[in-house]
């Protein structure tokens, strides 16, 4: 049996790392695949469904990223999908969220012009205890982001489908409590995955409930129902500012109203990145679990979509 590896970037580094970490495995690197029926595991960010279909003995897909919607767009494959849960990526995303929330909490955007330097000195800005941060999505990454804000003194609100018992987090659950969650937060950080239940979650009605809060999206762009809804909400002051590391489509069309807006920041999906050196070790550990007859971690629930 073989493991097929399909790196989406830095192929030589992945080859070197897996060679060291999985010396006893028969590793093939796409597109080299002499016998598709011998492929038992795939390590990749994505592959065409038509190619996956040729691996008739495939049992596991080990994703090279935290998101897994790319594997489920045309229905979940029969193979078990294992997503990447890397603390380094969680820390990167927490740092990104803290950076941008602090940027607008402290009014730093007002100092970037000569006029903004008038009245040099201290400014009257809300303190962290006066600036609750809401986290949409309370998985591993959302929990790390919440802890980062708590360490700085921010009250943290959390929204998810089922709620949370995380220490110190004010929990909101389900559609009925989403409006209250938004109204209680002065910044909203989205880390929800792309699933059928999250697509279009934030529409014009929901943006009107932000109450001037800053919106930071580092989950998936599909949570926003419409670019026009978001831009209109920013123009109306319902959303104080928006920082978008993810959009739909990605990147936005050149004519998108998101570009050139003085209260909208776009970054190119860099809030959290797969770091080969740490990710390869986590993937190799899951290969070892599979070989030992144990369940890898974390396994995607095909019904939930994550």
What does each model-identified segment do?
Residues 1-39:
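N-terminal glycine-/charge-rich "phosphate-binding" loop or analogous flexible N-terminal tail
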Residues 27-38, 49-52, 168-184:
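Short acidic low-complexity segments
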Residues 40-113:
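Phosphate/diphosphate ligand-binding glycine-rich loop within oxidoreductases
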Residues 78, 129-132, 212:
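Phosphate-coordination loops involved in phosphoryl transfer and adenosine-cofactor binding
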Residues 88-96, 110-111, 250-306:
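C-terminal helix-to-coil terminal segments
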Residues 111-144:
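Glycine-rich NAD(P)-binding loop of Rossmann-like domains
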Residues 151-168:
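NAD(P)-binding Rossmann-fold cofactor-contacting core
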Residues 163-257:
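Rossmann-like adenosine-cofactor binding region
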């Amino acid at each position: 049996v073989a493991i097929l590896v399909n790196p989406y970037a830095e192929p030589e580094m992945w080859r070197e790392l897996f060679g060291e970490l999985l010396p006893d495995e028969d590793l093939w690197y796409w597109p080299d695949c002499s016998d598709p029926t011998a492929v038992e595991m795939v390590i990749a960010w994505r592959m065409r469904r038509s190619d996956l279909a040729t691996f008739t003995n495939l049992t596991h897909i080990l994703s090279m990223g935290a998101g897994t919607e790319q594997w489920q767009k045309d229905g979940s494959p029969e193979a078990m999908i294992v997503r990447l849960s890397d603390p380094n990526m969680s820390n990167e995303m927490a740092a990104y969220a803290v950076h941008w929330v602090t940027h607008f909490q402290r009014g730093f955007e007002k100092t970037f012009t000569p006029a903004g330097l008038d009245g040099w000195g201290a400014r009257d800005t809300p303190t962290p205890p006066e600036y609750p941060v809401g986290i949409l999505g309370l998985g591993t990454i959302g929990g790390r982001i919440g802890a980062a804000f708590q360490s700085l003194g921010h009250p943290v609100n959390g929204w998810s489908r089922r709620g949370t018992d995380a220490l110190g987090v004010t929990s909101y659950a389900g559609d009925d409590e989403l409006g209250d969650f938004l109204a209680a937060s002065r910044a909203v950080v989205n880390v929800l995955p792309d699933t059928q239940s999250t697509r279009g979650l934030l529409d014009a009605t929901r943006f009107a409930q932000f109450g001037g809060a800053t919106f930071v999206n580092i989950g998936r762009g599909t949570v926003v129902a419409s670019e026009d809804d978001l831009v209109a909400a920013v123009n109306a002051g319902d959303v104080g500012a928006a920082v978008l590391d993810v959009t739909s489509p990605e990147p936005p069309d050149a004519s998108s109203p998101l570009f050139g807006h003085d209260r909208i920041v776009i970054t190119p999906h860099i809030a959290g990145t797969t770091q080969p050196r740490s990710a390869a070790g986590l993937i190799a550990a899951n290969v070892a679990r599979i070989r030992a007859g144990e369940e890898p971690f974390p396994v995607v629930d095909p019904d939930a979509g994550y």
